[in-house]
A protein has these predicted regions:
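Conserved serine/cysteine hydrolase catalytic core
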Residues: 177-216
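Active-site loop/oxyanion-hole signature of alpha/beta-hydrolase fold enzymes
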Residues: 42-83
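Gly/Ala-rich beta-loop-alpha elbow adjacent to hydrolase catalytic centers
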Residues: 83-92
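Conserved alpha/beta-hydrolase catalytic His-Asp/Glu region
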Residues: 118, 138-192
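Catalytic active-site module of serine/aspartate enzymes centered on a nucleophile-bearing elbow/loop
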Residues: 223-263
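Flexible "cap/lid" loop of the alpha/beta hydrolase fold
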Residues: 97, 103-135
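Active-site signature of alpha/beta-hydrolase-fold catalytic machinery across serine-
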Residues: 29, 94-98
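Conserved HGGG/HGGXW glycine-rich cap/lid loop of the alpha/beta-hydrolase fold
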Residues: 4-52
Length: 263
């Protein structure tokens, strides 16, 4: 696990968590854009880092715990903006659960609103992983030209951005561990109260529409978050393909958080 830092001259700290099955390099352009305003820590997960090909992804709690250690040791546990996209929002939730940390603004972009299946039987878990992970690994992790076009259409992304983010050398076990340790885990909505929580979805893709399907139910239950839809964006494309627009949205959200703190 590595941490890449940009804009150290700025006082406010922004932590960025990329999605699953991809590497940190896809987030470099937006990290560099955000570094014009914030001190940015871009996280590179084990198992999906081309700079550390010998590593293996273990679990979401493991990634979150070590990130928490890093922030506590170097920055006293203070995060001004915590950002995660797609699978990275699972890591984000475990970071929110770390009581050592104080987080002002949290932005979950492309957050899946459904939990993994709650399966107790090890045999059924293995079957679930075989089909769920196997399909993702085949479709994304080992995508050829035809599958790449399909994924880009589903996600509303360009092929150039797909080539930049996907890490094709990740091991099968790293892909398995991404999903295995999420089985039976349920989102703790009380954690939303520990921060000023924002959930964003860009619904110009079939993938994102499915991920957002339970947002209305969350709103009806009164969970503490601010919701925003980007109708012309696909899955992760606001940050991945429009870094300047992304920066404006992040700054606006964070300013709202700071205003709320003053009330």
């Amino acid at each position: 696990m590595k941490y890449f830092e940009f804009g150290q001259e700025h006082p406010e700290l922004m932590v960025m968590l990329h999605g699953g099955g991809v590497c940190y390099r896809g987030a470099l352009p937006v990290a560099e854009e955000m570094a014009k305003t914030y001190h940015v820590v871009l996280v590179a997960y084990d198992g999906f880092n081309p700079d550390e090909p010998e590593t293996q992804f273990r679990s979401v709690p493991d990634e979150a715990r070590r990130l928490g250690d890093y922030i506590v040791e170097r920055y006293g546990g203070k995060i001004d903006i915590l950002y995660g996209v797609s699978y990275g929002t699972f890591v984000l939730m475990d970071v929110l659960a770390d009581k050592r940390l104080t987080i002002t603004t949290t932005i979950a972009n492309g957050m899946p609103t459904m939990d993994y299946a709650d399966i107790k039987s090890p045999v059924l878990q293995n079957l679930y992983i075989f089909f769920l992970t196997g399909f993702s690994y085949w479709l994304i992790g080992k995508a050829g030209p035809i599958r790449k076009k399909l994924v880009c259409k589903m996600m509303g992304r360009t092929e150039e951005s797909f080539d930049r983010i996907v890490y094709k050398d990740a091991t099968w076990q790293s892909w398995v561990n991404q999903d295995k340790y999420m089985i039976g885990r349920h989102r703790n909505f009380d954690l939303f109260k520990r921060t000023d929580m924002y959930i964003w979805h860009g619904i110009a893709s079939s993938t994102e529409k499915k991920l957002a399907k339970h947002v209305r139910a969350w709103q009806d239950k009164g969970y503490a978050f601010t919701y925003k839809v980007f109708p012309n964006m696909g899955h992760g494309t606001l940050a991945g393909e429009h870094p300047q627009d992304f920066s404006k949205e992040v700054q606006a959200a964070h300013q709202c958080s700071l205003q709320k703190e003053k009330r």
